[in-house]
């Protein structure tokens, strides 16, 4: 919803989702004991936090674009890059064949465009991973179907809250379209996005659709 104050907020969370263990510095699990201690809640977030009827009631990482962390894009040396929109710039770099470390819940994913054979080969070289298969992240279960067989059970696994990597039988043409991803294997490891940053990258690639488009 473009009218929502958290539209495209990369750190959105509630008591039902978002990081817990990975931002905890010590117990008890209260905001001052987490990496969110440096971010004071704005009045709107404070009202949500204090309202027992709100889904963000006592959500320790509660924040919004006005009071929470900010996205940043850095080069390989750790220097911040002056970009207007880190998500849009990251997508552009991936589409140009670059390799990007994308922050996850507890670490980083080294990501590249899986349809770019040269980028995949470069990632293999940097990881010293000559043959071990890579998993591919897709926007949704429907977007997996052209590359692998997705039955009802597989779809349920892909969409499970744990967001596992699911091994699926490859379709004809998969190896040509995703060259170098899973060489010599009959199955493709597929997964769906599970963090706001991952969702935002696919959302950006789709043209920032509103609602349920």
Regions found by a protein language model. Give the residues of each.
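Active-site-adjacent structural elements in enzyme catalytic cores
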Residues: 1-213
């Amino acid at each position: 919803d473009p009218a929502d104050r958290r539209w495209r907020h990369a750190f959105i969370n509630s008591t039902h989702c978002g990081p817990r263990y990975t931002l905890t510095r010590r117990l008890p699990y209260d905001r001052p004991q987490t990496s969110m201690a440096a971010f004071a809640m704005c009045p709107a977030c404070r009202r949500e936090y204090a309202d027992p009827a709100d889904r963000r009631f006592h959500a320790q990482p509660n924040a919004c674009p006005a009071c929470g962390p900010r996205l940043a894009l850095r080069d390989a040396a750790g220097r911040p890059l002056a970009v207007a929109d880190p998500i849009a710039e990251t997508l552009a770099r991936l589409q140009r064949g670059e390799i990007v470390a994308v922050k996850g819940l507890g670490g980083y994913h080294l990501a590249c465009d899986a349809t770019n054979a040269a980028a995949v080969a470069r990632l293999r070289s940097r990881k010293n991973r000559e043959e071990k298969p890579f998993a591919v992240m897709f926007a949704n279960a429907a977007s997996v179907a052209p590359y692998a067989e997705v039955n009802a059970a597989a779809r349920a696994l892909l969409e499970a809250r744990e967001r596992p990597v699911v091994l699926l039988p490859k379709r004809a043409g998969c190896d040509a379209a995703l060259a170098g991803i899973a060489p010599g294997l009959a199955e493709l490891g597929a997964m769906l996005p599970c963090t706001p940053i991952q969702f935002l990258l696919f959302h950006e690639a789709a043209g920032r659709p509103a609602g349920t488009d």
